[in-house]
Amino acid sequence: MKKWCFLLYVCILSIWLVSCGVGDLSDKESDPEELQSSESAIKGTNYVMATCTNKKCVVLYDLDLYDGENLDNCEIWSFAPASTEAYEGGGGISGVKYREDTVFGDVVIVCAGNGYAAIVSYPDGETLWETLDSGSNSHAIEILPSGNVAVAASSGDTLRLFASSAVLQNDTEKASVYKEYFLKDGHGVLWDPEYKVLWAVGQEDLNAYTVAGEGSDEELILRDDLGTLKPGLYGHDLSADFLDANYLWVTGGSHVYHFNKETGELSLDYEFGDKLDKPSVKGFGNNPDGSYFLTMPNYGVGTSWEKESYAGWSTDKIFCFYPGEDGAELETVKCKSETRAFYKVFSFYGKYQ
């Protein structure tokens, strides 16, 4: 009798476990919508985010899905402003970052050449803050630990700091207010949690700014003891080195530089420089797993958009570099899209450093 009771108990327990979804999940299909909002999607190390000039949007790719044919099949998330007003006067999205922000939560921050900038919640895509006054030909955006946003713009030679955090107190008027600083041909901006400074790169300056004040009273103070001046740099992109917190990556007109924060040196003597150092790189970065990625214009040769005005700074390929088994070599993978014209590419690692 006890034996039969035990067997009955086992059967009931098995049925309950299956009904609760516990058991063999090897053949269970994943819901794409669940994938976009899952922890693995947020933390994925082989994810990159790119700005698309022809579609005027940003796209998130899972490069593990790349089959060597069409990068479009790897798209798992995208964002484009709901209002066409965001694109009046032209200019696609030129800057984007993903941040695990302590003020707004997980966000994607974007800026566009016509002055549009926004904080967008991830993964639901809700616009939390936006402006059409980020600067003339805005190129890069960063969100500070305070929730305020900094935008570098090239044609206007500006670095603007917005009191965007005020929107959380429903003060939209104050959230649109900004302080402006001169930055010749502003192209890149990046917060550094180690040095507690905002880095910004322009035509020949790589500057570091201390943030003083709080909330809408925050302001930037230039540090004379950090940064560097390099005539002919033509700085373009600025990103963290996720393998060494003492370095930044800086792309220029002719090279990809490794910047030593402590010494202020822009160096071309770095590991894998024979593959990574290229001219006219628009977007560059790495991931904590040791992979690298970049975009550089190929003028859309052979694409449907090669005669468009933006072809001169766009490409249909994202170059990815993966460490070999011994770590001594980098494998190059050219991820090609059949429909997208890319400008910049960014790491989807949500930490600042």
Go through each PLM region and give its residues:
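Bacterial N-terminal signal peptides
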Residues: 8-16
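Conserved beta-strand positions in repeat-built beta-propeller and related beta-rich domains
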Residues: 50-54, 109-114, 150-155, 198-204, ...
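Residue-level detector of Asp-centered blade-edge/turn motifs that repeat once per structural unit
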Residues: 43-44, 100-104, 144-146, 193-195, ...
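Bacterial Sec-dependent N-terminal signal peptides
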Residues: 15-42
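A short beta-strand motif characteristic of beta-propeller blades
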Residues: 72-87, 126-132, 173-181, 221-229, ...
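Repeated scaffold domains used in trafficking and secretory/extracellular systems
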Residues: 86-99, 135-143, 183-190, 231-241, ...
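Blade-loop segments of beta-propeller domains
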Residues: 74-118, 125-140
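Short loop/turn segments immediately following beta-strands, especially the blade-tip
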Residues: 62-69, 163-170, 210-219, 260-268
